[in-house]
Amino acid sequence: MLRNILVRSTGSNFKFAGRYMKSSALLGYYRRVNYYSTKIQTRLTSENYPDVHRDPRFKKLTSDDLNYFKSILSEQEILRASESEDLSFYNEDWMRKYKGQSKLVLRPKSVEKVSLILNYCNDEKIAVVPQGGNTGLVGGSVPIFDELILSLANLNKIRDFDPVSGILKCDAGVILENANNYVMEQNYMFPLDLGAKGSCHVGGVVATNAGGLRLLRYGSLHGSVLGLEVVMPNGQIVNSMHSMRKDNTGYDLKQLFIGSEGTIGIITGVSILTVPKPKAFNVSYLSVESFEDVQKVFVRARQELSEILSAFEFMDAKSQVLAKSQLKDAAFPLEDEHPFYILIETSGSNKDHDDSKLETFLENVMEEGIVTDGVVAQDETELQNLWKWREMIPEASQANGGVYKYDVSLPLKDLYSLVEATNARLSEAELVGDSPKPVVGAIGYGHVGDGNLHLNVAVREYNKNIEKTLEPFVYEFVSSKHGSVSAEHGLGFQKKNYIGYSKSPEEVKMMKDLKVHYDPNGILNPYKYI
Amino acid sequence: MTAAHPVAQLTAEAYPKVKRNPNFKVLDSEDLAYFRSILSNDEILNSQAPEELASFNQDWMKKYRGQSNLILLPNSTDKVSKIMKYCNDKKLAVVPQGGNTDLVGASVPVFDEIVLSLRNMNKVRDFDPVSGTFKCDAGVVMRDAHQFLHDHDHIFPLDLPSRNNCQVGGVVSTNAGGLNFLRYGSLHGNVLGLEVVLPNGEIISNINALRKDNTGYDLKQLFIGAEGTIGVVTGVSIVAAAKPKALNAVFFGIENFDTVQKLFVKAKSELSEILSAFEFMDRGSIECTIEYLKDLPFPLENQHNFYVLIETSGSNKRHDDEKLTAFLKDTTDSKLISEGMMAKDKADFDRLWTWRKSVPTACNSYGGMYKYDMSLQLKDLYSVSAAVTERLNAAGLIGDAPKPVVKSCGYGHVGDGNIHLNIAVREFTKQIEDLLEPFVYEYIASKKGSISAEHGIGFHKKGKLHYTRSDIEIRFMKDIKNHYDPNGILNPYKYI
């Protein structure tokens, strides 16, 4: 069905501030998730995973240890478990899938205190979990047993910003949204955007090498991070907080800490290159009939929208069906249902030019029949509304009772095949269908430019049968296509045993060597990663 | 300090304090027999007369010359692996070599190390036009990579003046910066995967890596810029961008460096996504270049203290022209710039770039030059050039003949905070060298800059890492070298 692009109303003006409203709305949805989830008590990780045992090398905290921490930290920097405070906020992960039993949270206000804590813990062999905003999805920042939690929340100062180069230096505990707000006032933008931006910390974002929606345009953190301040497991402070975009002196050590998930050092400071704030935003929502057409549209967008292309998201039909059930009051942007949908965002410095490029692009792909239907946001409200159809998918996937989430990378031509294969496997096992079958369906959506697929298996309940059908099937499938079992979310505790599906034994050995070298006592974020 | 010499003196003679490591075996006939058993005739160059192997022993700047009498040119990764395993077992020192275009002696032997050349590994392995992922052997020459991608409507995310000689693997090993850095960023962000042969011969490959792969430490990052000291890069996977359909350039005359910075901020705001280069040159650089390019008309009417070349590239020429024209008008009307000229066509575009690309050659044309490649915060970027000029003037060394220094020139990439300092000289003298070093390095350290923004460490800047790196960082680096190359056979006497 060929549908004319809606005539743009004159005088419409997009301001970046609109993105806040969208984010605030999104944050509201997340709060609802939390409220809903509190009805289900999180089980202890140690009970759910009886095969994982507490490492006997690690000391149990004593009053001597507590006295030491009291001698270097103020009262507000120490949180202890008590009858009225079980520290569940710190012990449970964002998804409420993992729960540790830590009795002590330390929240140092300076790098020197972090250093003293780690030096002591290393000497005494006390296990430590560094924690930022605790928004990770693979249990990477919560204790498994009784590890001491070292929170970076009190390290929350902006240290420096150079408005000429755009280089921001800040403490690791600065909340991502606050960092972005700060540079926005000076016409810059953080090169990364996450749904969890209201909670996650800059240091945690770097430690997990978060991807997010801006990777397509601004690249990965390996290119944006200019320097780091890190406290090593033995307490030594390594300061590479450079202001230089180019520094070709020696091995680029900071790169190892990006994505290391707090296993070889605690990031306490970040120097990062922010980007000029775009003056114009546009969003269009399109439908196509096959995943091959999704790829065709992507190729054309890269050619014709090129430097203004800032997001290219695809969603499958079922993901939008689920989203509809959550967005009851919102009108679906298109008239009919289609096998695949595409959300394209452009951002640039000149609205007229961007509008013109987008119009020409859409005319071309619709005339050629690759795109069957589409709309362009006419104003800020519509722009936010179109984004909702993408951003609501995680919430919608979970609304029937739960979701099994997989975040994987695959070559583009194979990107959607995992969803098809998973649905086929679930059907074959007669697990998918209407109630009382436990699986609603496997849906797929993701970032095309990054080759990143989010596979969400929406379920009415969690059960062993589903899990056995999905794993290791999903990982074996990804491996067979030379993909990665974790595109964005990292390894954490959840995917610790699956690294072999994406890395060779030689690579895994090299990684283990690095861990042993920097953390010989294994105290830093144990039981995870590798 | 880098001094260009017409014919290189033996490094061993020029630097008598550097001794051959007695742990390294001297090559013998059994070693030769082994290499002949795994390599074909055309993969081995062996001569007892080092002059015959001069192009492998001597660096691009003709400052360093080794005495290797064996060059191995394997045509596969497996052969590289066998060579490294054998050399590691026998403790034979090895220097990996690509196009040998680096500027700090990183890819030539110091004594009699075996040269392992990648030039026979020159195949494009794969290209995915949907994602832009390009995979090739390390020995593919940059010019050929550019041409291949150009034919497929893509652009390699890095461009270098030495593109006709340098190889993709060497570019990655030295973490070259180049002219596209402002637009496409660093290799740390653009390289997706590497295939590397470790000193012990093990092959480590994540060349099939995708754009997002968040599983474990990102090991490839260590090999980017490692200058062949912990592994030999044999294959590269990199993301190529869509080729721009429109190119434009404008040349400005400006009176002070503060205004250069203001212009940069304005360009980032108004040209934003189409800005692909922002180069500055000082008066001295352009004066040298005007003399050098005698017959080429200077694009501006007057002389100025500073010049800026801005390049834009995008997908729509009309839009880009409008943006750049508006930018030029606005900066002229507000008197931010004294003078500006916009390219009218491709020939104009190339001519404007000639004024930037000719600066190094122009500075070198009086007899030689001392080159420094450094990073500083933008506000301090030009201060090192001014400080050096003042120091040379105070010593009465700059001026007309017979004074030895012609001019002290500063130019570079503003967006990267990268300044190239070129001291154009009629002759090399100890007095100049003593004035420049360690003054330049100490100055950089005092401003918390980097002594090597682009060119790396190599042999030339070994021992100078402490001007930029802390003791703990240097120790960490040495740990890594010792861990991966416990026998120290891979590219010894350099780096750290």
From Swiss-Prot, chain A:
Keyword Transit peptide assigned: yes
A GO term from the CC aspect: mitochondrial matrix
User: What EC class is this?
Assistant: oxidoreductase
Q: Which reaction does it catalyse?
A: (R)-lactate + 2 Fe(III)-[cytochrome c] = 2 Fe(II)-[cytochrome c] + pyruvate + 2 H(+); (R)-2-hydroxyglutarate + pyruvate = (R)-lactate + 2-oxoglutarate
So which cofactors does this thing need?
Answer: FAD
According to its UniProt record, the EC number is 1.1.99.40, 1.1.2.4
Q: FAD-binding PCMH-type domain: from which residue to which, for each copy?
A: 98-277
Q: Which InterPro entries match?
A: FAD-bd_oxidored_4_C, FAD-bd_PCMH, FAD-bd_PCMH-like_sf, FAD-bd_PCMH_sub1, FAD-bd_PCMH_sub2, FAD-linked_Oxase-like_C, FAD-oxidored/transferase_4, Oxid_FAD_bind_N
Q: Does the keyword GTP-binding apply?
A: no
Q: Which Pfam families match?
A: FAD-oxidase_C, FAD_binding_4
Localization annotation: Mitochondrion matrix
Task: Please give a single GO biological process term from the UniProt record.
Answer: lactate catabolic process
Q: Name one GO molecular function term.
A: (R)-2-hydroxyglutarate dehydrogenase activity
- Main localization, broad class: mitochondrion
Keywords linked to the UniProt accession: FAD, Flavoprotein, Mitochondrion, Oxidoreductase, Transit peptide
Please indicate which superkingdom the organism of origin belongs to.
Eukaryota
Any further remarks? Answer: Present with 11400 molecules/cell in log phase SD medium.
What is the similarity comment for this entry?
A: Belongs to the FAD-binding oxidoreductase/transferase type 4 family.
So what does this one do? Catalyzes the reversible oxidation of (R)-2-hydroxyglutarate to 2-oxoglutarate coupled to reduction of pyruvate to (R)-lactate. Can also use oxaloacetate as electron acceptor instead of pyruvate producing (R)-malate. In addition to its enzymatic role it could play an important role in the yeast cell morphology.
The name of this protein is D-2-hydroxyglutarate--pyruvate transhydrogenase DLD2
From Swiss-Prot, chain B:
Enzyme class, top EC level, equals oxidoreductase
Q: Does the keyword Membrane apply?
A: no
**Cofactors that this protein relies on:** FAD
Localization annotation = Cytoplasm
Domain FAD-binding PCMH-type per the UniProt entry, residue ranges? 64-243
Tell me the domain of life: Eukaryota
Task: List its EC numbers.
Answer: 1.1.99.40, 1.1.2.4
Reactions it catalyzes: (R)-lactate + 2 Fe(III)-[cytochrome c] = 2 Fe(II)-[cytochrome c] + pyruvate + 2 H(+); (R)-2-hydroxyglutarate + pyruvate = (R)-lactate + 2-oxoglutarate
Cellular component per GO?
Answer: cytoplasm; mitochondrion
Chain residue numbers at which the record places covalent cross-link Glycyl lysine isopeptide (Lys-Gly) (interchain with G-Cter in ubiquitin): 17
Main localization, broad class: cytoplasm
Against PROSITE patterns, the record matches this protein to:
FAD_PCMH
Q: Which UniProt keywords apply?
A: Cytoplasm, FAD, Flavoprotein, Isopeptide bond, Oxidoreductase, Ubl conjugation
Tell me, which GO biological process terms does this entry list? Answer: filamentous growth; lactate biosynthetic process
A GO molecular function held by the record: D-lactate dehydrogenase (cytochrome) activity
Q: What does this protein do, in the record's words?
A: Catalyzes the reversible oxidation of (R)-2-hydroxyglutarate to 2-oxoglutarate coupled to reduction of pyruvate to (R)-lactate. Can also use oxaloacetate as electron acceptor instead of pyruvate producing (R)-malate.
- General remark: Present with 13000 molecules/cell in log phase SD medium.
Provide the family line. Answer: Belongs to the FAD-binding oxidoreductase/transferase type 4 family.
Protein known as: D-2-hydroxyglutarate--pyruvate transhydrogenase DLD3
Q: Which organism is this protein's natural source?
A: Saccharomyces cerevisiae (strain ATCC 204508 / S288c)
